[in-house]
Amino acid sequence: MAFTPFPPRQPTASARLPLTLMTLDDWALATITGADSEKYMQGQVTADVSQMTEDQHLLAAHCDAKGKMWSNLRLFRDGDGFAWIERRSVREPQLTELKKYAVFSKVTIAPDDERVLLGVAGFQARAALANLFSELPSREKQVVKEGATTLLWFEHPAERFLIVIDEATANMLTDKLRGEAELNNSQQWLALNIEAGFPVIDAANSGQFIPQATNLQALGGISFKKGCYTGQEMVARAKFRGANKRALWLLKGSASRLPEAGEDLELKMGENWRRTGTVLAAVKLEDGQVVVQVVMNNDMEPDSIFRVRDDANTLRIEPLPYSLEE
């Protein structure tokens, strides 16, 4: 990507975040175009894309035949097809899997590195962007297109915007916001996604979890009414037979080192510690606190105490901004 990522700063929790413009280079864009785009995606992802309007974006999962997610995709309509945003570390293998059946359909599936992904969040983010765009997305209209630019609106953990933009316009936007906004990289957006309870699937965890183990059903990412898609049988079984015993949790506290994606944690059991869970993502905030996104059993006690393996510090469960009650 020719657009240079902004230098990193220690991320800040949403409640204290000043106006911040971020380069989202740890995320990547991909597209599907052609006459069969909608039909093809409908047979591949967990969401009902046939019901998606131009004004919506959805978090959907792309699964293998066993219902395990290759990746999750932030999906929106783009031109005559769809575009989606996923972690850069999983894009290549995810596209390889998605293309496996494409020979029989009128579709073109490709990575898109021509466009740049930017995030805007923090204090008065809407006011800052209102000076630069004629219309901004909102709860009622979550996707807005202006020329070659697409803006996506997110409510959690606090109002923020993801901008899909060409390089020249990205440079112009950066110049206009440079004076009033702090600049940061993907880690700040990652911290906000962890706080929002949006599952982060990197390469280490690709092919490991069914969508419900990462709360996708609570985020509107699974349709149980649509027709067949790859992995549907296992995803449906997890719902209707209660086969899913896992959930995504948010932990916060201290740790002398950041756990990596794919690593386990330890749960305090009386005087002992027992290994548990799988870390999806973790970030250290500027106040020294650590936030960890982890998949664990869905019946954890709310006052459970955790730690990074063999660490002296502890982590505790924080509430997510959505309910898992069905």
UniProtKB/Swiss-Prot annotation:
Q: Which UniProt keywords apply?
A: Cytoplasm, Folate-binding, tRNA processing
Which InterPro entries does this one have?
GCV_T_N, GcvT/YgfZ_C, tRNA-modifying_YgfZ, YgfZ/GcvT, YgfZ/GcvT_CS, YgfZ_barrel
The Gene Ontology CC terms held by the record are: cytoplasm
Q: Name one GO molecular function term.
A: folic acid binding
Q: Which Gene3D superfamilies match?
A: 2.40.30.160, 3.30.70.1630, Aminomethyltransferase beta-barrel domains (3.30.70.1400)
Q: Which cysteines are joined by disulfide bonds?
A: none
Localization of this protein: Cytoplasm
By its UniProt entry, which SUPFAM superfamilies does this protein fall under? Answer: Aminomethyltransferase beta-barrel domain, Folate-binding domain
Binding locations of folate: W27, W189
Please provide the Gene Ontology terms (biological process) for this protein: iron-sulfur cluster assembly; RNA modification; tRNA processing
Family membership, please give it: Belongs to the tRNA-modifying YgfZ family.
Task: Name the job this protein performs.
Answer: Folate-binding protein involved in regulating the level of ATP-DnaA and in the modification of some tRNAs. It is probably a key factor in regulatory networks that act via tRNA modification, such as initiation of chromosomal replication.
The identity of this protein, by name, is tRNA-modifying protein YgfZ
Name of the gene encoding the protein in the UniProt record: ygfZ
